[in-house]
Design a protein with these regions (language model features):
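Acidic/His- and Gly-rich active-site-bordering loop/insert found
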Residues: 2-103, 108, 112-128
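General structural feature for long, well-ordered alpha-helical segments within catalytic domains
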Residues: 3, 14-21, 34-45, 73, ...
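Divalent metal-coordination and catalytic microenvironments
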Residues: 25, 64, 77, 107, ...
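Histidine-centered active-site/metal-ligand motif
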Residues: 26-28, 103, 107-110, 166, ...
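Short, small-residue-enriched loops and turns at beta-alpha junctions
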Residues: 28-33, 84, 141-142, 246-248, ...
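Histidine/acidic-residue-rich, glycine-tolerant segments that coordinate divalent metal ions
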Residues: 62-63, 84-86, 91-102, 108-109, ...
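Metal-dependent amide/peptide-bond hydrolase catalytic core
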Residues: 215-391
Length: 391
């Protein structure tokens, strides 16, 4: 006789446990690639369960495998667990205890959800018809990210398909969002230094003013997006920092800027990078300046595989969650590296709640999570295992 399980009911029974684990981790946020406390916390939870543990994978990663009694598919889920250099301003009992650091992007929630899923799988491991691999990843917030290091160290060995989620405060609790194909952009970073000739502010003719030339570069660079790229293609070029000089009457020797480029394909990446360099070459020729440009390509765009996306959609609908097709998002995620080597899909789990005042955006010192979202994400993962015929 086939045992039929109510995944939402099982996830709901784990709600208080997932909330407690999230709050434990929320009080101990750690920067990317330095997640020692969190690494050990996750290991301590997993050691209570009947699973094979491999650690460290890469630097601080953990791989937990639940092995079924029967042969079948090998499905992986991933959660990240690093925090951000943000000073938390929430007045809550589980506020960060680490000065200057905060779980301001929900990674504590991601990990708590996956640990809750692990406990449910452990309790029903006699039903497994394949293997379930849980990947706990460090260092998502800072390039080059932890995913590629974990892949290189074998975290996807024998895995057939991989899924992941990101809690999202911009969507209400009880919703699941995803889309086939591209869903998240490649987040490139660049910096430019223009070297002119400093001098007295009253005698600009005796100088080569790098501030004016930098201003010309910044304004002209915007035309790369608006005038050289097909308007139906998504691309963003943003300058986030400009730095030059220290006095009102001194023209400095140099000016510096930093920014980001967001695209969904490598051709656009190359086009924008090339155009920026050509623009600087022209300014150098016209103004007798020199320059340095450092352009760093970020994570690959996140591209969901069509069949895995359909599984996410089916799971949400069968669980009576409110499924919606996501908009294209210009944020970056190193989950993309898993999807380059294995089929799979990434989805967003709504965790916003206007009535509770949980509306702050990610990376904000007031960011928080409607913790009721945990049971929705956990039940979605479990339903995916059922559809994939692992549970």
């Amino acid at each position: 006789m086939v045992e039929v399980l109510d995944w939402f009911q099982l996830a709901s029974k784990k709600e208080s446990r997932m909330i407690q684990m999230r709050r434990d981790m929320h009080q101990h946020p750690e920067p990317s690639f330095e997640e020692t406390w969190t690494h050990n916390y996750i290991l301590n939870q997993l050691r209570k369960l009947d699973c094979q543990i491999e650690a460290p994978i890469g630097r601080n990663g953990i791989k937990a495998t639940f092995i079924g009694a029967e042969q079948g598919p090998v499905i992986a889920f991933r959660a990240d667990f690093d925090a951000l250099p943000v000073q938390e301003l929430n007045d809550v009992p589980y506020k960060s205890k680490n000065e200057g650091y905060m779980h301001a992007c929900g990674h504590d929630g991601h990990t708590a959800i996956l640990l809750g899923v692990a406990e449910i799988i452990h309790e029903h491991r006699h039903l497994l018809k394949g293997n379930v691999v849980l990947i706990f990843q460090y260092g998502e917030e800072i390039m080059p990210g932890g995913s590629q290091e974990m892949i290189d160290d074998g975290c996807l060995r024998d895995v057939d398909k991989i899924y992941g989620t990101h809690l999202w405060s911009g969507y209400p609790t009880g919703t699941i969002y995803s889309r086939p194909g591209a869903i998240m952009a490649s987040p490139d970073e660049f910096s430019v230094t223009i070297y002119g000739k400093g001098g007295h502010g009253a005698k600009p003719h005796e100088t080569i003013d790098p501030i004016v030339i930098m201003a010309e570069f910044i304004l002209s660079a915007q035309k790369i997006i608006s005038r050289t790229i097909d308007p139906v293609k998504e691309a963003v070029l943003t300058f986030g920092m400009i730095q030059a000089g220290s006095s009102d009457s001194v023209i400095p020797d140099s000016a510096f800027c930093k920014g980001t480029v967001r695209t969904f394909d490598t051709e656009l990446q190359t086009h924008i990078q090339t155009k920026m360099d050509k623009l600087l070459q022209g300014l150098a020729l016209a103004n007798d300046i020199t320059y340095d440009m450092n352009y760093v390509r970020g994570y690959l765009p996140v591209h969901n595989h069509a069949d895995a996306y359909e599984v996410v959609k089916q799971a949400a609908n069968e669980m009576h969650l409110r499924f919606n097709e996501s908009e294209l998002m210009m944020i970056g995620e190193d989950f993309s590296h898993y999807l380059k080597v294995r089929p799979g899909a990434f989805f967003l789990t709504g965790c916003g709640n206007k009535e509770k005042g949980i509306t702050a955006p990610h990376h904000n010192p007031h960011f928080d999570i409607d913790e009721r979202a945990f049971k929705y994400a956990a039940s979605e993962f479990l339903k995916i295992l059922e559809i994939e015929q692992v549970l």
